[in-house]
């Protein structure tokens, strides 16, 4: 199947109570904090970054709305994430999630446990590639490496061969219509003892292809698992990235210029398709550079008439959202303006405040500086204004 014809949906199973993960007062394990964020928040963030178009349904317990709502608000995914109430068993919860996606015209669906927060994008890509090659169902799994024993009460009865044995993981991925039909058939037959979705697929005769799982993709089951996950994230190396941007616009006769979103009266204006705010254009490029998301022209082509005369804050706020959707936190924004006139000093504080508002970061993290070009070159001849911008962004850490 061609990639352009594939449309994935995601079911995140999060309705469990997690009795083995500690006392009820600590709350369900999917909402316990690890690395400063809830387990499920890490999980959802990975899928949001992997595919910015696929719908996600979170199957949650009826009592967990107050826990889930603030997490969804922080992720700011809008209508991409919906919720549905789960059933008494995992099997019933998955079926509820699949039914909730029925209006999206999906070709495939990934079903993932919320308490596997370390799922990686490369695994999701491998799964998608197998579907493109024709696989109906895909199961990430690891070969069993421990010696297996069968026991009776407190005695070993026999050693079980581990040849051909695998430990199943999630996400388990399928043709959407096939796995929906399989779950419906299982429910209609009264069979409720399936422990994963691949088992249901096998029961209905669907072929499931194995792909390599990951030792990092652990399921947080016990209280000590959550403690280890928190320790792992707490000792992660910070992924600090720096992006640079440069822009220049010509000056022409006019009544003022807009720089960093602030209009300054002047006997010239900047020439451009939008409002020609050279500072915000440079900073937009700097932010996009931190996550390899192209440049301002890729997102807002100057050939598109809808951006004619547009306020450049639209571009900057979009770039900030792209950064956050990729798991980034903007730490600092620095803009250097190069112009003979107008004077920037009297407006610097207003510019910093505008940047702080547009980026949603503290004022102390926003810097605006200005210099002349000592009457040299096109800037020195007052033919244009240039801007250099640097953005510092911290992305989710890499575990040691």
Swiss-Prot record:
Region of interest: 2-C-methyl-D-erythritol 4-phosphate cytidylyltransferase: 1-240
Catalytic function, reaction form: 2-C-methyl-D-erythritol 4-phosphate + CTP + H(+) = 4-CDP-2-C-methyl-D-erythritol + diphosphate; 4-CDP-2-C-methyl-D-erythritol 2-phosphate = 2-C-methyl-D-erythritol 2,4-cyclic diphosphate + CMP
Stretches for region 2-C-methyl-D-erythritol 2,4-cyclodiphosphate synthase: 241-400
Entry-linked Pfam families: IspD, YgbB
Cofactor(s) required for function per UniProt: a divalent metal cation
Pathway the protein takes part in: Isoprenoid biosynthesis; isopentenyl diphosphate biosynthesis via DXP pathway; isopentenyl diphosphate from 1-deoxy-D-xylulose 5-phosphate: step 2/6; Isoprenoid biosynthesis; isopentenyl diphosphate biosynthesis via DXP pathway; isopentenyl diphosphate from 1-deoxy-D-xylulose 5-phosphate: step 4/6
InterPro entries named among the record's database cross-references: IspD, IspD/F, IspD/TarI, ISPD_synthase_CS, MECDP_synthase, MECDP_synthase_CS, MECDP_synthase_sf, Nucleotide-diphossugar_trans
Keyword field: Isoprene biosynthesis, Lyase, Metal-binding, Multifunctional enzyme, Nucleotidyltransferase, Transferase
PROSITE patterns: ISPD, ISPF
EC number: 2.7.7.60, 4.6.1.12
NCBIfam families, alphabetized: ispD, ispF, PRK09382.1
PANTHER family: 2-C-METHYL-D-ERYTHRITOL 2,4-CYCLODIPHOSPHATE SYNTHASE, CHLOROPLASTIC
Function: Bifunctional enzyme that catalyzes the formation of 4-diphosphocytidyl-2-C-methyl-D-erythritol from CTP and 2-C-methyl-D-erythritol 4-phosphate (MEP) (IspD), and catalyzes the conversion of 4-diphosphocytidyl-2-C-methyl-D-erythritol 2-phosphate (CDP-ME2P) to 2-C-methyl-D-erythritol 2,4-cyclodiphosphate (ME-CPP) with a corresponding release of cytidine 5-monophosphate (CMP) (IspF).
Protein name: Bifunctional enzyme IspD/IspF
Organism: Agrobacterium fabrum (strain C58 / ATCC 33970) (Agrobacterium tumefaciens (strain C58))
